[in-house]
Amino acid sequence: MNVNLMWFRNDLRLSDNSALHFSCRNNASTVLALFIATPKQWERHCLAPKKKMLIYKNIVALKKKITELGIIFYYYESTDYLESTNYIIEFCKIHKVTSIFFNLEYEFYERQRDKIIKKKLKKNNIIINCFHDSVLITPGSIKNSYGKMYKKFSYFKYKCIKQLQLNIPSCFPKPQNKNLHDHYSLDFTIPIFHTYLEKFDANIFPIGEDIVYEKLKFFIKYAFNKYNFDQEIFELNSTSMLSAHLSIGVISPRQCVTLLFKEYPDIIHKLEECKWINELLWREFYQHLLYFYPNIGQNQSLYHWENRIKWDNNLYYLNLWKQGNTGYPIIDAGMRQLKQLGWISNRLRMITASFLVKNLLIDWRKGEEYFMSQLIDGDFASNNGNWQWIASVGTDSMPYFRIFNPMLQSKKFDINAKFIRKYIPELSNVSTYNIHNPCDNNKTNKIHSKYPQPIINYYHSKKKTLLVFKHAKCSNKL
C-alpha cells in the first residue's frame, strides 16, 4: 500500500494547499502529516518571538483540524535544517513512506535544505512531489523578451495582471476524510517550542485558518472599498491585517484573489487601479526575485555600487531608533508600535526605514535584521525587498535622492497626531503643531521635558546623505 507523507512547512492550512491536495487525491493511499520545528534555525534567522508564537498556535490548530480528517499528525523539534533532513529519512523508513509532498520555500537556507533532502529521498527511492504554493503565478512564467525575470515592478505587475485576467486562479478544496485503516490516533499535546516566545494580540491576529478566512471575507465585503483611500493611514482597520497569516501560510494569496473576484466580478477589468492587488503583487514580485536571485538571502543587493557607501553605523543612534527615542515623534511612535504589537503599517515601515538609512546613515541590513526580529508578519522576501527599495540599492528602488521627511509625513498621515499620542503618552498634552515640528522649537529644541530632543538635524543629515550616495554612485562609474 502507498503511504504519502505531507510535510507541512510554511503552509499551515488545509484549504487550498497544493501539496496536501495532491497527497490526498488517491483514496487508496494512506496519508501521514508531519511538521518539524527548527527554533534554533529560526533564531539564527532572527525570527520574531511573536511570529514563533503565532506559528506554534497555528500548528496546534492545524493538528486538531487535520486529525478530524483522519490524517495522523506527527510533530518533531529539530536542532536545525540539516538534522531535520536526517529525521525525515528515518521517519520515512519507519512508516514505509513511498511518496513525500511539500510546498517550496525560496529562501537561501531553505533551498539548501531541500537540495539535501531531495538527494537523500532519491537515494531511498521515495517519490518527491513539490509545488509552488505561496505565489499566485509560478516563478519563471513571467519573463521579459530576453527570457529573464523582470527587475522593474511596473512591467512585472502589467504581465501578472494580464495573466490573472486570462487565467483566473482557482483554489483547491479541503481534503475529504481519510480512512485510517489499521492506524491509530495519536493523541498528544504539541510541546511549546524551545525558544523565546512572546504573546501577541489574538484579536488582531486570530488563530486557525477558518477564523482567518472569515476575517478575509469581512475585509473584502465591508472594508475593501475603503482600502484605496485608507491604506496609508496608521489605524489598524485601514488594512486587511492578513500579512501575518500570509507569511506562515494560514491563508493563501489565491484565496485572497479568488474571493475578491467572487465578491466583485467586474474588478477583473480594473486590477491596475486596485491598491490591494498592487500590494499582493509587490509581495509576488519579491518572492519571484528571491527565487531567481537567491544571493539576496546572503546580505547582498543586486547592485554592487552600494558596497562603496560609507555608512556611519552609529550604534548609539541605532539603539535610540530601535527604542523609539530619536526625538522625531512619528519615527518613535512607529518604532514603539513595532515593539508592542509586532506590526506597523507599510507607510510607517517606509518612514522609519528611510530615517535609519538616509538620515542616520546606518546600513540597511541592520534595519532589515531588526524588523525581522520584531515583525509578527516577518517575510524574508518582502522585508529584504522593501529595505533594499528604501535604501535605493535594490531592483526598481526609489532614487537615492528621495528621502522621506518625517515632519511632512507626520502632518500628512497623522493630521491630528492621534497615532503619535497613543504610542508616546508623554506628548499627550503637547500641541499638534509642536508634535509635527520637533525641530522648530528654537529655544530648547525640545518639545517636552520627558521626551528627547531630535538626535540629528533632518536637513543637515539629508545633505550629508546625498553627498555620500552621490559619491558612491559616481565612483562606480569610474
UniProtKB/Swiss-Prot annotation:
<dbReference type="InterPro" id="IPR036155">
    <property type="entry name" value="Crypto/Photolyase_N_sf"/>
</dbReference>
<dbReference type="Pfam" id="PF03441">
    <property type="entry name" value="FAD_binding_7"/>
</dbReference>
<feature type="binding site">
    <location>
        <begin position="239"/>
        <end position="243"/>
    </location>
    <ligand>
        <name>FAD</name>
    </ligand>
</feature>
<dbReference type="InterPro" id="IPR036134">
    <property type="entry name" value="Crypto/Photolyase_FAD-like_sf"/>
</dbReference>
<feature type="site" description="Electron transfer via tryptophanyl radical">
    <location>
        <position position="364"/>
    </location>
</feature>
<comment type="function">
    <text>Involved in repair of UV radiation-induced DNA damage. Catalyzes the light-dependent monomerization (300-600 nm) of cyclobutyl pyrimidine dimers (in cis-syn configuration), which are formed between adjacent bases on the same DNA strand upon exposure to ultraviolet radiation.</text>
</comment>
<feature type="binding site">
    <location>
        <position position="227"/>
    </location>
    <ligand>
        <name>FAD</name>
    </ligand>
</feature>
<dbReference type="InterPro" id="IPR014729">
    <property type="entry name" value="Rossmann-like_a/b/a_fold"/>
</dbReference>
<feature type="site" description="Electron transfer via tryptophanyl radical">
    <location>
        <position position="311"/>
    </location>
</feature>
<dbReference type="InterPro" id="IPR005101">
    <property type="entry name" value="Cryptochr/Photolyase_FAD-bd"/>
</dbReference>
<dbReference type="GO" id="GO:0003677">
    <property type="term" value="F:DNA binding"/>
</dbReference>
<dbReference type="InterPro" id="IPR002081">
    <property type="entry name" value="Cryptochrome/DNA_photolyase_1"/>
</dbReference>
<keyword id="KW-0157">Chromophore</keyword>
<dbReference type="GO" id="GO:0009416">
    <property type="term" value="P:response to light stimulus"/>
</dbReference>
<keyword id="KW-0547">Nucleotide-binding</keyword>
<dbReference type="GO" id="GO:0006281">
    <property type="term" value="P:DNA repair"/>
</dbReference>
<feature type="region of interest" description="Interaction with DNA">
    <location>
        <begin position="346"/>
        <end position="347"/>
    </location>
</feature>
<keyword id="KW-0285">Flavoprotein</keyword>
<feature type="domain" description="Photolyase/cryptochrome alpha/beta">
    <location>
        <begin position="2"/>
        <end position="136"/>
    </location>
</feature>
<dbReference type="GO" id="GO:0071949">
    <property type="term" value="F:FAD binding"/>
</dbReference>
<feature type="site" description="Electron transfer via tryptophanyl radical">
    <location>
        <position position="387"/>
    </location>
</feature>
<dbReference type="Pfam" id="PF00875">
    <property type="entry name" value="DNA_photolyase"/>
</dbReference>
<comment type="subunit">
    <text>Monomer.</text>
</comment>
<keyword id="KW-0227">DNA damage</keyword>
<keyword id="KW-0456">Lyase</keyword>
<comment type="similarity">
    <text>Belongs to the DNA photolyase class-1 family.</text>
</comment>
<dbReference type="InterPro" id="IPR006050">
    <property type="entry name" value="DNA_photolyase_N"/>
</dbReference>
<feature type="binding site">
    <location>
        <position position="110"/>
    </location>
    <ligand>
        <name>(6R)-5,10-methylene-5,6,7,8-tetrahydrofolate</name>
    </ligand>
</feature>
<dbReference type="InterPro" id="IPR018394">
    <property type="entry name" value="DNA_photolyase_1_CS_C"/>
</dbReference>
<feature type="region of interest" description="Interaction with DNA">
    <location>
        <begin position="279"/>
        <end position="286"/>
    </location>
</feature>
<protein>
    <recommendedName>
        <fullName>Deoxyribodipyrimidine photo-lyase</fullName>
        <ecNumber>4.1.99.3</ecNumber>
    </recommendedName>
</protein>
<keyword id="KW-0238">DNA-binding</keyword>
<keyword id="KW-0274">FAD</keyword>
<dbReference type="GO" id="GO:0003904">
    <property type="term" value="F:deoxyribodipyrimidine photo-lyase activity"/>
</dbReference>
<feature type="binding site">
    <location>
        <begin position="377"/>
        <end position="379"/>
    </location>
    <ligand>
        <name>FAD</name>
    </ligand>
</feature>
<feature type="binding site">
    <location>
        <position position="409"/>
    </location>
    <ligand>
        <name>DNA</name>
    </ligand>
</feature>
<keyword id="KW-0234">DNA repair</keyword>
